[in-house]
């Protein structure tokens, strides 16, 4: 039995019946107006209308009637939930409205009629749901009513808020479109030809290998020789992908934070992603042919000749890889990896057959005996501005670190000039420049200390009795060094005094500006207090004013936060400017020293010509004595000597 929930008034079926011909209207049957169907239409004492002929007498109650009674109770409960609806068996079609005979025969509401076995079966299989279109219409109607209620409840302030929120949502969509057009794409390192990766990520020491390969091999040489099943056990994929993404961005992650299996998987991934075979397509068949030679000597000679024909980068990477894996095989007791295991792992990775790999591993000394795995030293970092980094102590260490930093500086300049806008690279550029300034200053101090120790040792070893002309010549060199140091110190002091005067003038102007700003702040505060006292009498507790105050408070907090960020940037810029000034002072000192040396070299030939013109009267003064006199005269004439005692 299907149930269609039909509204009591203006249903579509009634309209169709009314529109058809003969103007006949359907009279409700006795079942449709039964008191059990519509309780409340009849009084309780009145007898109910006669039932249909198909119903059985009430005294015989069968099992079917009991089941039917249960269904009737359920139907009554459902009626209470849906008031104003009637349950019909079928909607009357237009054909029924046309013929009156059909109207009389039409069975109305068969709720209490005992169905036959076939009808009961049909009723159980019919669907008791509304059509989908009617449900969709009802949902739309409910949504429209909900929107109408909301629009009625909204106030003017809510409408303004909604308009502002829509405006804010629209604005940021248009802004980020412009920088996305200019941002160049960063090329990856994995999957590119070996020569390109070498040109982009080669280390400072000039070894033509990619940085990812060098760093992975160094790490595995340190930490992977005691790991069981190395290069056979795979690392964690998420960590391998993380390292791969970092190297693709041309960063240098700290591999010490990862496990050996993860780094080994990263190295295998790089070798697997190489677009070309290490032995090249042209030479690969010839390597296979060389494996078929009869004697081992012929195999080695043919392999040596073929390896010389390989490109430089391919030959170098292959030699480093074979030597490194030979170290792994040498630690077989700890790594559990022999030649067979390494060949099984490496063959699908580098696309080289097991026969060729076996020859390479069994003749490492003959083929790659001169290869030495050079350890990479990372450049010095100065991440924390509050502390000074630990600089090398010896001159050789300082010069080596300067070479590393200058190589890194050139790479950063090349990337930034290529159009790649990266804030992290710009910050690293400033960091490298600061480190270079500190290293050069430390190198000068080390040279000065070395000269002083040399002079002290020479003075201590000298004795007054054993003074000769050869020793005097050696002392002249010491005197010249001392004079050069004195000149350098004097010129540097002059530049520092000039910088001091400039900074004092700047400080005075800044103090005046601070006083002016304080006066303005005091004046504004007094005006605000005066304005508050006037407005307190006429102030009203309106919602709009409180909202404006909240917005102003938010704007004020935002401005304060921006001001703090600008102050931090200003401090960084001031530090950088100060370092650049120090570098300029050093360059000026060097220029002045070069000018003084050039002037001395021009004066020396003139002094040598004068005694020749005089006829050789009197012996020429010693060069060392002349230099001492010239230095003393310059020291007297220089104004920096009078300023030595002035505090800086």
Curated annotation (Swiss-Prot):
Membrane-topology annotation of the record: Peripheral membrane protein
Role of this protein: Multifunctional protein that functions as a downstream effector of RALA and RALB. As a GTPase-activating protein/GAP can inactivate CDC42 and RAC1 by stimulating their GTPase activity. As part of the Ral signaling pathway, may also regulate ligand-dependent EGF and insulin receptors-mediated endocytosis. During mitosis, may act as a scaffold protein in the phosphorylation of EPSIN/EPN1 by the mitotic kinase cyclin B-CDK1, preventing endocytosis during that phase of the cell cycle. During mitosis, also controls mitochondrial fission as an effector of RALA.
Marked site: Arginine finger: 232
Written domain comment of the UniProt record: The Rho-GAP domain mediates the GTPase activator activity toward CDC42.
UniProtKB keywords: Acetylation, ATP-binding, Cell membrane, Cytoplasm, Cytoskeleton, GTPase activation, Membrane, Mitochondrion, Nucleotide-binding, Nucleus, Phosphoprotein, Translocase, Transport
Keyword Membrane part of the UniProt annotation: yes
Region ranges (Mediates interaction with RALA and RALB): 403-499
Biased composition regions of type Basic residues, renumbered to the chain: 69-79, 102-118
GO CC terms, sorted: cytosol; membrane; mitochondrion; nuclear body; plasma membrane; spindle pole
Residues the entry annotates as binding ATP: 69-74, 418-425
Span list, region Disordered: 1-158, 525-552, 598-648
Residue numbers spanned by region Nuclear localization signal: 102-119
EC main group: translocase
Gene from which the chain derives: Ralbp1
Molecular function as annotated in GO: ABC-type glutathione S-conjugate transporter activity; ABC-type xenobiotic transporter activity; ATP binding; GTPase activator activity; small GTPase binding
Keyword set includes ATP-binding: yes
Tissue spec: Ubiquitous. The highest level of expression was observed in ovaries and skeletal muscle, whereas the lowest was found in spleen, liver and peripheral blood leukocytes.
Protein name: RalA-binding protein 1
GO biological process annotation, one example: regulation of Cdc42 protein signal transduction
Posttranslational mods: Tyrosine-phosphorylated upon stimulation of cells with EGF.
Catalytic reaction(s) noted: an S-substituted glutathione(in) + ATP + H2O = an S-substituted glutathione(out) + ADP + phosphate + H(+); ATP + H2O + xenobioticSide 1 = ADP + phosphate + xenobioticSide 2; leukotriene C4(in) + ATP + H2O = leukotriene C4(out) + ADP + phosphate + H(+)
Major localization listed first in the record, in broad terms: membrane
Documented EC number(s): 7.6.2.2, 7.6.2.3
Mediates interaction with REPS1 and REPS2 as annotated region, ranges: 500-648
In-chain residues carrying the UniProt-annotated modification Phosphoserine: 29-30, 34, 48, 62, 92-93, 461, 463, 638
Boundaries of every Rho-GAP domain copy: 192-380
